Regions:
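Acidic, Ser/Pro/Thr-rich low-complexity regulatory regions
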Residues: 1-164
Length: 164
């Protein structure tokens, strides 16, 4: 009989890429919720609990779990977008920090030329546009990307910096 865990692969992938980027965004609380609610504990929850503070092992376990079955990457994108929206509006991260973190996150997701979802590719290139704005090559005012990032299904890089 195959074991069924209530742990969602979308959540696992989200936490995997966040940990790979150096952000925990509530990982411990997320895992503790499963530790408290599952009875008996599923194998994946047990494996994650045994990782302790070993981030590399945790990432490896999450990666293996995510690769077992397909999952909805758009759900992950929405979680990532919500994280950056909150970080931006609560001033936990500046535009520069957000764009460089988005870049690192996109690198952790895959090949920038082969992103299935436009958000990952847009995050990859956004850091370049931030650098152009910092260097004065494009107007910094045009780099106020927050509303576009938070409200759209995908980020359309070229529309961010074109004024009409």
């Amino acid at each position: 009989m195959k074991e069924v865990s209530s742990l969602k692969r979308e959540d696992a992938f989200y936490h995997k890429i966040m940990l790979m980027t150096g952000l925990d965004d509530g990982y411990d609380e997320w895992l503790n919720c499963y530790l408290e609610s599952e009875n008996p504990l599923s194998n994946i929850v047990l494996e994650l609990a045994c990782c302790g503070s070993d981030i590399n092992k945790t990432i490896s376990v999450l990666h293996s779990f995510c690769m077992e079955q397909p999952f909805d990457e758009a759900i992950v994108c929405n979680k990532v977008r919500a994280f950056f929206k909150d970080a931006y509006y609560t001033n936990r991260m500046s535009k520069e920090e957000i764009s460089s973190t988005m870049y690192r996150l996109a690198l952790n997701v895959g090949d920038p030329g082969d992103f299935d979802i436009h958000l990952w590719g847009s995050m990859y290139y956004l850091n370049d546009y931030c650098s152009l704005a910092k260097d004065g090559i494009i107007p910094w005012e045009n780099f106020d990307f927050a509303e576009e990032v938070w409200e759209q299904e995908t980020i359309h890089i070229f529309s961010l910096f074109c004024t009409e």
